[in-house]
Amino acid sequence: MSIRSHEQYALLTDYDTGSAYSEAYHTVFANIRFSWESDSTPQHTLLLATPSPYTEQAGVVANVAIVAAQSGTSTILVDADLRTPSLQQRFSLGKSSGLSELLAEESITPEKVAASLCKTFIPNLRLLGAGDTTRGGASLLLSSKLETIINCLRNLAAEAETSRGLVIFHSPPVLSGADASLISAQVEQTFLTMVAGRTTRVQVKQAQEQLQRSHAKLVGSILLDV
């Protein structure tokens, strides 16, 4: 799957639905959806991660989530990049509690997770932002609490009126630490995004090996800037 270079930083809502930019993301989502439509589970979880730092990665994940929501899928987008969060700003949402605060809770309940979700201006799309990342230490709690949070998010997606639900995670780069690997071990599918001319074969190989050690289900890739 590929997306040509055309301001990946911008949200799809800034473009005409018939534009090549928009069509590229619809093609990407169609391929993602094809990979899980045969699954009997109506709620699906996935991670889109890049091997090395890429500033437009958050925009790529946001646009895939937008297409999913526009297709009628109840979609929850999670900003799990607790180092450089940006999704709340991209959707023009004010500061609010998010993933960092949930990870700091002694007991995580569906009610607490639901209260942390923000509605976006796009129907069917809600955001769990990174929250206040200045407190530090949140990443250390991912391994012990992420499974509970994902189960709550899955159930919240199931409560929507649409027939299918999707939870999409945005994470730090795979090779920058353990966060992406921890998330990939908990979600059903992981896709690697690679940037032509920037992402090297060595980085891709190292990222694949790291994800495989986490028992991630790596099912595909997205090529940017071709």
Protein language model features and the residues they cover:
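Short, well-ordered turn and helix-capping elements at secondary-structure junctions
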Residues: 32, 52, 132, 171-173, ...
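P-loop/Walker-type NTP enzyme "switch/lid" segment
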Residues: 2-26, 30, 37-45, 51-54, ...
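Conserved catalytic-core segment of NTP-binding enzymes
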Residues: 139-226
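Short amphipathic alpha-helix
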Residues: 63-64, 138
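Hydrophobic positions on the alpha1 helix immediately C-terminal to the Walker A/P-loop
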Residues: 60
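Aromatic pocket-lining residues of Rossmann-like dinucleotide-binding sites
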Residues: 68
